[in-house]
Amino acid sequence: MPIKIPDDLPATSVLEAEGVMVMREADAVRQDIRPLRIGLLNLMPNKVTTETQIARLLGATPLQVELTLVRMTNHVARHTPADHMLSFYCPWEEVNDQRFDGFVITGAPVERLPFEEVTYWDEMRRVFDWTQSHVHRTLNICWAAQAAVYHFHGMKKYDLPAKASGVFRQRSLVLASPYLRGFSDDFAIPVSRWTEVRKSDIPADSGLKVLVDSTETGLCLLDDPRHRSLHMFNHVEYDTTSLADEYFRDIQVQPEAKVPVNYFPGDDAKRPPENRWRSHAHLLFGNWINEMYQSTPYDIERIGKV
């Protein structure tokens, strides 16, 4: 089934060209089914790129999805045109009386700051608390995952000696988890971060389950049943060229920046990278949506009440 997004969103033409089924708003209202309402709180600098990445993964599932783009209320995006934000994004304070089957919160370029120094941290804490009463399933990515386990479980983040950048092997630890249905025993996904949270800091009484980790880069995916959340510490949603784009940006200001590990063939940045994580990205999002669909109430107003 297709994903329902605004007709004029730049992602529409990109996804249609890739063969992703995109449903126009006028067509969606003619289908006599309730679509899954999923919100995307997009904290990444390039909003258009990230919204396209997430919409691509949501749109590949067999259920109709209605995507709502959300921004922090008072934070001004500096790398995305103001007219795009005005046309397609809702401030969180304007949607926090609504209910969502699913809610995705992205990474953010603030991970080297203490959480309390992030300008929108107070609102971020309110968002996390709001998900417990207004959202059925939440997926936190990279910085948002670190922020969520800090908020809910008091888990600190630690600076890494150098940026972890590349495509790293991961181990599936709980293949019986519905979120890992179809996963290989090991697989590779992109990592791009300066900080980490540690398995040794998981509180014994937290209910957190480590689903995926890496001997090189540590925690990858945590299941948080008590908060109906998944915490993905890496960037499974990245495009083929995302790490390359970051690398070429970084060397403009830091010429000694290292080439992403296991990414360019032969570690030669002049050669085009290959995507080795696409299938697992689709599996994760598909499994997450399936679990959401199986358990969310048909009457969306009952979310948070049952």
Curated annotation (Swiss-Prot):
NCBIfam families linked to this entry: metA (TIGR01001)
Gene field: metAA
Active site per the UniProt annotation: 142, 235, 237
Keyword Membrane attached: no
Family classification: Belongs to the MetA family.
GO BP terms in the entry: L-methionine biosynthetic process from homoserine via O-succinyl-L-homoserine and cystathionine
Any one Pfam family match given in the protein's UniProt record, by short name: HTS
Site (Important for acyl-CoA specificity): 111
Organism field: Brucella melitensis biotype 1 (strain ATCC 23456 / CCUG 17765 / NCTC 10094 / 16M)
Lineage: Bacteria, Pseudomonadati, Pseudomonadota, Alphaproteobacteria, Hyphomicrobiales
Protein name according to UniProt: Homoserine O-acetyltransferase
